[in-house]
Amino acid sequence: MFLSAALRARAAGLAAHWGKHIRNLHKTAVQNGAGGALFVHRDTPENNPETPFDFTPENYKRIEAIVKNYPEGHKAAAVLPVLDLAQRQNGWLPISAMNKVAEILQVPPMRVYEVATFYTMYNRKPVGKYHIQVCTTTPCMLRNSDSILEAIQKKLGIKVGETTPDKLFTLIEVECLGACVNAPMVQINDNYYEDLTPKDIEEIIDELKAGKIPKPGPRSGRFSCEPAGGLTSLTEPPKGPGFGVQAGL
């Protein structure tokens, strides 16, 4: 029933070792939430219903094309892509942009708020030009994503959830981005950078500072997600339809 002193000491050591990996529930979602709140909006000088927002003429044409992808009378189905379009135009989603989306799609504003607060990909507060999203979920953590996160913080002089003074970079932690076989990895805007070392991420940041877009994908020399030692299957083009089928069939 009682732990020995040695076992208690061992348990304490493990707790200290793993403590830095323990994160609060929904931490990444909270980081993306308005004012640090997961589902709550509070008016601020830069984010309120009177914040100027309207789509450009070009984006209104894109919205028309998007809506045509859905059956007549089902404009509401276009909430996700139209919100994404608003974010790409503005860089983030003030509540006035959500209201504009609701107006265009003829849905109650609450329907748009529900979507914008559910998906962490929607930024409900301003972010830098380059949004660095570091995966720290288990596979990346086991591949030392902590070293990538620490290298970014040291390089940029900011902590998780902060933006550089020049508004170039915002740093956040995110949950799994679906590229576990290329861990550790980060997403910067729409691009994945994989198989990273601290030196790799520093070089990527330097290129971005210089106005260049680094080549996305693995930094280890792999083409995609094949084994590091090379392919072990599918080493030649497929034979095509009918290969191996009995002649009489």
From Swiss-Prot:
Residue list for modification N6-acetyllysine:
61
**Which reaction is recorded as catalysed by this protein?**
a ubiquinone + NADH + 5 H(+)(in) = a ubiquinol + NAD(+) + 4 H(+)(out)
Which residues in this protein are found as Phosphotyrosine?
A: 193
Keyword Metal-binding in annotation: yes
One matching Pfam family, short form?
Answer: 2Fe-2S_thioredx
Claim: Calcium is one of the keywords in the record = no
Q: Which residues bind [2Fe-2S] cluster?
A: 135, 140, 176, 180
Q: Which biological processes are named by the entry's GO terms? A: mitochondrial electron transport, NADH to ubiquinone
Q: How is the cofactor bound?
A: Binds 1 [2Fe-2S] cluster.
Q: Which domain of life is it from?
A: Eukaryota
GO cellular component assignments = mitochondrial inner membrane; mitochondrion; respiratory chain complex I
Transit peptide feature range:
1-32
Q: Write out the GO MF terms.
A: 2 iron, 2 sulfur cluster binding; metal ion binding; NADH dehydrogenase (ubiquinone) activity
* Protein's membrane topology: Peripheral membrane protein
> Where does this protein reside within or beyond the cell?
Mitochondrion inner membrane
Q: How is the subunit organization of this protein annotated in UniProt?
A: Core subunit of respiratory chain NADH dehydrogenase (Complex I) which is composed of 45 different subunits. This is a component of the flavoprotein-sulfur (FP) fragment of the enzyme.
Family assignment from sequence similarity: Belongs to the complex I 24 kDa subunit family.
Q: Name it.
A: NADH dehydrogenase [ubiquinone] flavoprotein 2, mitochondrial
Species: Bos taurus (Bovine)
